[in-house]
Amino acid sequence: MAFIRRTVQTNIFEEFYPTTLAFNAGKKNYFLGHSKDKSYMIYNMTDAGKIEPTVVVQKGKLKTYLQNIQAFYDTTQNKQYLYGYNLDEKVIDVYQIADNASIVLMYSEEFTVEDSIKSATFFIINGVLCFYTQSDKTKNWYIYNLINY
């Protein structure tokens, strides 16, 4: 398989977004840009993969600047979530993504770790939210269950 890179769109945002995510909600595509001042913007995306910079779905400030964000889906409850973490501040935030692409904070935790974490991801198995981490120093890894009670 061969790939050829071609430019399909170029534009300018008012902010620099060091953390970004493209995701799907309600059968539509969206782009989230998140800046170090904790602000974020969610933009509509076309079916051709182009960002519509004038169509802002939601904007605001997150609780924390998140260095990495990902989306994951709970098949048992048909809900989608966005999670992010800041390894410097040792913070994990989980947001629920609505069908209209708006996000609402569902869970936030300041965490302590057994080692120095440099890798992390969330996933859901049988309706249980799990968090994987790995230390770059010791190579030890851990899986935690985050149980709602």
Sequence positions of predicted segments:
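Beta-strand initiation motifs
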Residues: 1-6, 48-55, 100-107, 149
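Surface-exposed loop and turn segments in beta-propeller and other repeat-based domains
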Residues: 3-12, 56-63, 109-113
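Repeated scaffold domains used in trafficking and secretory/extracellular systems
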Residues: 12-26, 61-74, 113-125
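Entry beta-strands of beta-propeller and related beta-repeat scaffolds
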Residues: 27-31, 77-82, 127-131
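Eukaryotic tandem repeat interaction scaffolds
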Residues: 32-73
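Structural motif
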Residues: 37-44, 88-96, 137-146
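Loop/turn-rich, solvent-exposed surfaces of beta-rich toroidal or solenoidal domains
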Residues: 66-73, 80-90
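Blade-level signature of beta-propeller repeat domains, shared across WD40, Kelch, NHL, RCC1
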Residues: 119-149
